[in-house]
Amino acid sequence: MKYLLPIVPLLISFGGLAQCDQNAIWNNTSTNEICTEINGSVKYWYTNSLPDHVTGTFPGQGNPHSISAQQTELTMCAYPLEAGEFTDLLIGGFNALGQCPTFEFGLATNGIEWDPVAAEWFENPNTGAINYDWNENALSPLVNLGTDMIDAHVQPTGKYHYHGDPTNFITGLGITSSEHSPIIGYAADGFPLYYKYIYADAQNSNSAIVEATSCFILKSGNRPGDGTTAPDGGYDGTYVEDFEYDGSLGGCLLDQCNGRFGVTPEFPNGTYYYVITADYPVVPRCFAGTPDMSFSIGPPPAGCEVSNGESICFALSIEPSATEIADRLMIYPVPSNTGMLNVFIAGNQVIQPTQVSILDNSGKIVKTEAYHQRISINELKSGVYFLKFTFDKTEIIKRFVKK
């Protein structure tokens, strides 16, 4: 859990939150149904994976499969924390032995999964050998995966899933460009997902509503391949590897995972969150937190598609000490016109963070290091920043200004 000044502690009562009858959900094979519940630190989702909006015609459109009800159970952390490093959805490719090759990104609030990674790669035209370094972009008009009008299609099992922007679903939610998007889903790591209309200032809920745009661009020049063992020709978006992230783009609000830390209507004290954008990647291609293995793709005997929430998720502390730590933790001088910040934790009880991160005003992590009572900010430009202190099962954020 993260806190922004002023600190507002969130007290959670564990237990008593179970409410889902998964068998009743799975027995419904004709209409959309979904339920979620929290048990301890893990959030459980049960859905029959039937869409609640108009879809394309299946079988057809290059896809021979029919939509059918599923018995889907997924888990994620109810109180996610940032991992300190990003995890790609494409873990190692389908040639990776002994591990799950890819992750689905997450789940929409209607129970339909986002699975943006295409199981298609560059193929040697002479030998049929697969080059797993070049993954086809499912959203490219040059790639035909038999998707419908909202870039969704059906797996051989009958499961309907999204590859891109599910506009029919979005329209049904009544989302417009005049107000901040509601939560439209959750990533496999538990952080929320929003549509493209968000606050211009990540830390100010009174700022203008803007359309967040992708910070990815097509690479310049030509691919290095020979057209036989690897693709050649200009970078045109046929492959995921045709794109690169450029955080220096004007108006860039999002990080490499199409996300940022900031306030939202549902999280007035701030959270990390993801955003669906109009252009590539549209659906995020990496995680800022730790994804649950129930969203991985691969054989269950190898640990794929099996929940590991009990081992990766942490419950929020409901003890007064969480609030006390926030009140006792002080940084000075603020504002700072020196190259150092001092940290002081009042009281006799020895409580220390394990690490500290500096976030800029957009919520992007500038640096992370082991905790010290004196923190160098000499390299920072003038502006508003945040210090994120990571304790055992609590994160506390303090704002400061570098002059």
Predicted feature locations:
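Extended, compositionally biased non-globular segments
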Residues: 189-191, 196, 200-299
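Short, acidic, Ser/Thr-enriched surface-loop or helix-capping motifs
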Residues: 108, 187, 358-360
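A glycine-anchored, Pro-Gly-centered beta-turn/N-cap motif
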Residues: 158, 270, 381-384
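Solvent-exposed N-terminal domain segments of exported/luminal and surface proteins
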Residues: 19-146, 150
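Short loop/beta submotifs within extracellular cysteine-rich repeat domains
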Residues: 84, 114, 168-173, 280-285
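Sequence termini and other peripheral, non-core segments
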Residues: 18-64, 279-281, 286-321, 380, ...
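Histidine-centered catalytic micro-motifs
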Residues: 157-167, 272-276
